[in-house]
């Protein structure tokens, strides 16, 4: 990877994305009501966001860019086309609009949330900081262990990859949130909620894992499908059907995301992963309702079963496509390149 060239391309991609988001902010002046005209005006930006990440070849720049633009930003723009979603608030400032469009963030703008924010204690904030630092140390430890990967059993490497994927995703999204918070000075909803503490699949996917993706899937898929199904089926099947569709859409979008990482035809394994979890989550909900008050697993047991199921199925269906195309090795190899480049630049700035 040519670092200077990749960083230059990265800058060009994001300058283009910011310019496109500025254009989107003023589309309502031409099409004040959501509908076909606004959708037509936004489609060029949707297409631009699809093609921009193809210019990047590195995992650590191309991956987040594809997630932010191709999936999250485009889904927000499609909602915006019909005057729905987080971008439809006419009081958003230009900077607020751009940040909401391009970054995986959601601002706390409810007065009750402001009151809640004021009630937070300093010790609680410090606990969050200490926990995040611990995650950074753990992440660095995983990278160090990779130096001995040739001597490690396959299942150990799969476990490391699962932790790597989680920690890398949370750290990357947290960096985006820090930029938005520093720029706008506003409080944000959390992007992850300690998914390793989940006690059920519903808890894991609905309340703990990648909450920005869950939120946008709820607005674009789950809620509309549930409204349609509510006319034809009972509540239990309405919820289960909408959930399964949302998981399927998530799987398809992960296939798209994986294409940007591998530049290879989809294998549909990752779609299978999310369809499987959609079915299992729906079954879990039905079973929990059927045995409510009769059977209750200890939190430690249900937590271990939940996280274990996610990791085992992840190693079976989620990771193989990335490993098959060498994305894992490419990702690992980029860390020393980034470290050496950053070290060189810092030493240059300090005159050493």
UniProtKB/Swiss-Prot annotation:
It is found in: Microsome membrane. Its main location: membrane. GO terms for molecular function: long-chain-alcohol O-fatty-acyltransferase activity. The chain crosses the membrane at residues 13-33, 34-54, 67-87, 128-148, 155-175, 239-259, 267-287, 303-323. InterPro entries: Wax_synthase, Wax_synthase_dom, Wax_synthase_Magnoliopsida. It comes from the Eukaryota. GO terms for biological process: lipid metabolic process. The keyword Membrane applies. Its EC number is 2.3.1.75. Pfam families: MBOAT_2. Keywords: Acyltransferase, Endoplasmic reticulum, Lipid biosynthesis, Lipid metabolism, Membrane, Microsome, Transferase, Transmembrane, Transmembrane helix. One of its GO terms (cellular component) is endoplasmic reticulum. It catalyses: a long chain fatty alcohol + a fatty acyl-CoA = a wax ester + CoA. It is a multi-pass membrane protein. Belongs to the wax synthase family. Catalyzes the final step in the synthesis of long-chain linear esters (waxes). Has activity with both saturated and monounsaturated acyl-CoA ranging from 14 to 24 carbons in length, but C20:1 acyl-CoA is the preferred substrate. This is Long-chain-alcohol O-fatty-acyltransferase. It comes from Simmondsia chinensis. The lineage of its organism: Eukaryota, Viridiplantae, Streptophyta, Embryophyta, Tracheophyta.
């Amino acid at each position: 990877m040519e670092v200077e060239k990749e960083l230059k391309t990265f800058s060009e991609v994001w300058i283009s994305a910011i310019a496109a988001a500025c254009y989107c902010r003023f589309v309502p002046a031409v099409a004040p009501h959501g509908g076909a005209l606004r959708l037509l005006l936004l489609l060029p930006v949707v297409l631009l966001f699809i093609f921009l990440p193809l210019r990047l070849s590195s995992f650590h720049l191309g991956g987040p860019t594809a997630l932010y633009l191709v999936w999250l930003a485009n889904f927000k723009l499609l909602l915006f086309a019909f005057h729905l979603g987080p971008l439809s608030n006419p009081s958003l400032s230009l900077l607020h609009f751009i940040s909401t469009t391009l970054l995986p963030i959601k601002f706390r703008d409810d007065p009750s949330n402001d009151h809640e924010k004021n009630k937070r204690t300093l010790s609680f904030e410090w606990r969050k900081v200490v926990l995040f630092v611990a995650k950074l140390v753990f992440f660095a430890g995983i990278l160090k262990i990779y130096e001995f990967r040739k001597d490690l059993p396959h299942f150990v490497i799969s476990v490391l990859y699962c932790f790597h994927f989680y920690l890398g995703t949370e750290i990357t999204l947290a960096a985006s949130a820090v930029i938005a918070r520093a720029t706008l000075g506003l409080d944000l909803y959390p992007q992850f909620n300690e998914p390793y503490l989940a006690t059920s699949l519903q808890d894991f996917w609905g309340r703990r894992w990648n909450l920005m993706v869950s939120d946008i899937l709820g607005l674009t898929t789950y809620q509309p499908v549930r409204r349609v199904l509510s006319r034809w089926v009972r509540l239990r099947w309405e919820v289960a059907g909408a959930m399964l569709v949302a998981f399927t859409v998530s799987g398809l979008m992960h296939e798209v995301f994986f294409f940007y990482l591998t530049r290879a035809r989809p294998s549909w394994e990752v779609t299978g992963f999310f369809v499987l979890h959609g079915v299992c989550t729906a079954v879990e909900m039905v079973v929990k309702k059927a045995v409510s008050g009769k059977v209750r697993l200890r939190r430690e047991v249900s937590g271990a079963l939940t996280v274990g199921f996610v990791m085992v199925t992840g190693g079976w269906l989620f990771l193989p496509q990335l490993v098959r195309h060498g994305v894992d090795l490419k990702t690992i190899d980029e860390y020393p390149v980034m470290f050496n480049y950053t070290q060189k630049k810092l030493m240059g700035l300090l005159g050493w």
